[in-house]
């Protein structure tokens, strides 16, 4: 019979995405067997992050301050606003080094079935920001899913009210991809979005 405390630790690990029962059990026993100091460090880091990290009041990205570094930066373009679903989308875009504007993080996408509407995505905050008149281009970088497309359409309609240019990230064949391995939906998007050369 397994200890209730160990079971509680395993159940806690199962709360994490992509961690199933076996992985959770391996993680729990890994920490308890020979890595208790690492376990304390992990627990401390989690507790510290949960206490100190909140949301930027302007863009809703994760931040330790009321206004995050992206919004506070004087070197970023303030007339471009990239709309993303999650903070990890911001990380991915920043790693590309291509974009130097500001962000707005939805923390999800429209999903009426799950009770996620415009208010849950912070769209009233976005509307207020668009109404200020500084944003000239809104870049929609939501995921190419049904929900992501619906969310992008909703935001596009909002931007039209303020006469703001709206662009959408291109979709299609990845660089280095081979046609025979591309799914038909992606290939269809690539054909629909083709450009003159």
From Swiss-Prot:
Q: Which PROSITE patterns match?
A: RECR, TOPRIM
Per the UniProt entry, what are the Gene Ontology biological process annotations, in alphabetical order? DNA recombination; DNA repair
Q: Which residues form the Toprim domain?
A: 79-174
Q: Which GO terms describe its molecular function?
A: DNA binding; zinc ion binding
Kindly list the ranges of residues that form C4-type zinc fingers according to the record: 56-71
Instruction: Extract the SUPFAM superfamilies matched here.
Output: Recombination protein RecR
**Pfam families on file:** RecR_C, RecR_HhH, RecR_ZnF, Toprim_4
**Ranges in coiled-coil conformation:** none
* Alphabetic keyword roster: DNA damage, DNA recombination, DNA repair, Metal-binding, Zinc, Zinc-finger
HAMAP family for this protein? RecR
Please give the function described in this protein's UniProt entry: May play a role in DNA repair. It seems to be involved in an RecBC-independent recombinational process of DNA repair. It may act with RecF and RecO.
**What family does the Swiss-Prot or TrEMBL record give for this protein?**
Belongs to the RecR family.
Protein name per the record: Recombination protein RecR
Q: Which organism is it from?
A: Hydrogenovibrio crunogenus (strain DSM 25203 / XCL-2) (Thiomicrospira crunogena)
């Amino acid at each position: 019979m397994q200890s209730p405390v160990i079971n509680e630790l395993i159940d806690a690990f199962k709360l994490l995405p992509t961690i199933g029962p076996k992985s959770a059990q391996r993680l729990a026993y890994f920490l308890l067997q020979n890595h208790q100091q690492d376990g304390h460090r992990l627990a401390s880091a989690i507790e510290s992050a949960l206490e100190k990290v909140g949301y930027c009041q302007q863009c809703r990205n994760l931040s330790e301050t009321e206004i995050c570094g992206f919004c506070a930066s004087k070197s970023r373009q303030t007339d471009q606003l990239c709309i993303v679903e999650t903070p990890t989308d911001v990380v991915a875009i920043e790693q590309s080094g291509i974009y130097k504007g500001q962000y707005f993080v939805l923390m999800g996408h429209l999903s009426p079935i799950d009770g996620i509407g415009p208010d849950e995505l912070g769209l009233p905050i976005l509307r207020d920001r668009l109404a200020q008149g500084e944003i000239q281009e809104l870049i929609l970088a939501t995921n190419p899913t049904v929900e992501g497309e619906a969310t992008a359409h909703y935001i596009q309609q909002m931007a039209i009210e303020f006469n703001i240019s709206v662009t959408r990230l291109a979709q299609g064949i990845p660089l280095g991809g081979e046609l025979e391995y591309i799914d038909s939906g992606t290939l269809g998007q690539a054909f629909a979005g083709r450009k003159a050369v």
